[in-house]
């Protein structure tokens, strides 16, 4: 395996792409704001343009089924005068649910010449942000004593949105086994102790 070292100290990047998401409560729903900037750190902003893209995507999500209720795309900085003409197309996100199949549907609707590469990227990456925001809202309720279980609403067997989302949440995998052994997300140390810790505890009980 080839180990890639970090860039040399003081090296100036050729390109910087920054993506940020913020999720806010909106009654029972969520509002997620995605922001993308692309810049050239070597440029002085005079002889050469420093910021080449600055774009924003705002969506409203119904938390019951993770369906998009509203979507607004805004281009603040763009390379062609005509670029903002595609902003309104992203209202086509409305009605989609950010569960399995969402990424494929976004690519089908907005990929390539049907959309904007950068706004499509913001839209495509929404899924994990929404899932984490829902989990964070539950964690907030636990921290306030309003709930005892981070999985409230998930049937007590794990978030249906987390299932098969990664190697930890594979069906029958590490998270499932920890849940069976009594672990509840949002409780105890962070990160969660290794699975063997829970299994040993189970055997000694």
Language-model-detected regions and their locations in the chain:
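N-terminal intrinsically disordered, cationic/polar leader segments
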Residues: 7-10, 14-44, 52-54
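Active-site- and interface-proximal helix/loop "cap" or "latch" segments in soluble metabolic
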Residues: 36-205
């Amino acid at each position: 395996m080839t180990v890639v070292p970090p860039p040399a100290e003081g090296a100036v990047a050729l390109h910087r792409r920054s993506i940020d998401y913020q999720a806010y409560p909106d009654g029972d729903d969520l509002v997620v704001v995605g922001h993308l900037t692309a810049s050239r750190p070597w440029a002085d902003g005079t002889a050469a343009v420093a910021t080449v893209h600055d774009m924003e995507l705002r969506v409203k999500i119904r938390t019951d089924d993770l369906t998009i209720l509203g979507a607004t795309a805004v281009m603040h900085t763009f390379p062609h005068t005509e670029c903002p003409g595609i902003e309104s197309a992203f209202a086509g996100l409305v009605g989609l649910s950010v569960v399995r199949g969402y990424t494929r549907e976004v690519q089908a609707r907005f990929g390539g010449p049907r959309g904007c590469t950068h706004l499509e990227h913001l839209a495509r990456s929404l899924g994990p942000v929404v899932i984490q925001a829902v989990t964070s809202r539950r964690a907030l309720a636990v921290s306030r004593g309003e709930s005892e279980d981070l999985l409230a609403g998930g049937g007590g067997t794990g978030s249906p949105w987390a299932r098969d989302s990664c190697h930890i949440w594979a069906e029958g995998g590490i998270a499932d086994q920890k849940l069976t052994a009594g672990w509840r997300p949002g409780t105890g140390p962070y990160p969660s102790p290794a699975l063997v810790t829970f299994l040993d505890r189970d055997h000694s009980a």
